[in-house]
UniProtKB/Swiss-Prot annotation:
Induction notes from the record: Associated with stimuli that promote myeloid differentiation.
Alphabetized UniProt keyword annotations: Chemotaxis, Cytokine, Disulfide bond, Secreted, Signal
SMART domains: SCY
Signal peptide start and end residues: 1-21
Protein name, UniProt field: C-C motif chemokine 6
Tissues of expression: Expressed in myelopoietic bone marrow cultures stimulated by GM-CSF.
GO MF annotation: an example: chemokine activity
Coiled-coil intervals: none
Function, in words: Chemotactic factor that attracts mostly macrophage, but it can also attract B cells, CD4(+) lymphocytes and eosinophils.
Length: 116
């Protein structure tokens, strides 16, 4: 009887932990969807923050300023900085991004942060 209670407790624990792991993975996946990585390029030039993918939704109200990526990047990009300091890459040719640019001020570069 004691072994069956232990086994049931173990299976309940595994089920709870498994569901938590799935939830965490789903949250991280959702975060990557809205905040694609910004990768710092170069060894000598420390001012080149580049975008390799773009966020699909740009909520302008969340951002306080922006700056363009450097000319040494493969893809052009606009990096928006949120109130929390999060960096979000956006496509500069997107109409929604252009609207955001008209309402926000251009700010300083990111300070050489590496976001992966």
């Amino acid at each position: 009887m004691r072994n069956s209670k232990t086994a049931i407790s173990f299976f309940i624990l595994v089920a709870v932990l498994g569901s938590q792991a799935g939830l965490i993975q789903e949250m991280e996946k959702e975060d990557r969807r809205y905040n694609p990585p910004i990768i710092h390029q170069g060894f000598q030039d420390t001012s080149s923050d580049c975008c390799f993918s773009y966020a699909t939704q740009i909520p302008c109200k969340r951002f306080i300023y922006y700056f363009p990526t450097s000319g040494g990047c493969i893809k052009p990009g606009i990096i928006f900085i949120s109130r929390r300091g999060t960096q979000v890459c956006a496509d500069p040719s997107d109409r929604r991004v252009q609207r955001c640019l008209s309402t926000l001020k251009q700010g300083p570069r990111s300070g050489n942060k590496v976001i992966a």
